[in-house]
Amino acid sequence: MKNYRAIGLAFTFTALSSLSAFAASLPGGASTLQETYQDWTVSCQSQKDTTACVMRQEQSSAQAGQRVLTAELRNVAGGKVDGVLLMPFGLDLAKGASLKIDDTAGPNLTFSTCLPQGCLAPVSFDAKQVAALKSGTNINVTTTALSPSQPVAFKISLKGFGAALDRIQALTK
């Protein structure tokens, strides 16, 4: 279990280091911060006068205890949210994935690469979609298993999404 936690933290801090930095500092002069907002975790890293934050949700298999999905998002200019979904191996990468915010169609995703932890699908939500995320219940992700070829569905809870996003925006002003 510690190995998966370490992989998750490595993934987070790799993502944090690649984000554009913001001129802000964390409360109390801390160099890192981690807070939980219902089903979302806010993770921030501060170096000198820059702070980068992401919000993350990890889902694990109840049977095996292994991570099956990680959603990692950050706010960008214009009220948009960008990020990545880390999904398990065994999916038909050529078919990508589709998202719905509750029952409303969202962006279609294309897998960009695979890492030892799983396969990455970049995601971007415009301001209108972000408003729907803040008031929604779930992001419904549908993709296809490679063999046998059948639909695979994931639900990403939006409990705490708005509070986590507001916190990231406040910390990176």
Swiss-Prot record:
Cysteine disulfide links: none
Could you confirm whether the keyword Lipid metabolism appears in this record? no
Q: Where is the signal peptide?
A: 1-23
Q: Which domain of life is it from?
A: Bacteria
Q: What keywords is this UniProt entry annotated with? A: Signal
Q: Which InterPro entries match?
A: IalB_sf (IPR038696), Invasion_prot_B (IPR010642)
Protein family per UniProt: Belongs to the IalB family.
Spell out the protein name for this chain: Invasion protein B homolog BMEI1584
Q: Which organism is it from?
A: Brucella melitensis biotype 1 (strain ATCC 23456 / CCUG 17765 / NCTC 10094 / 16M)
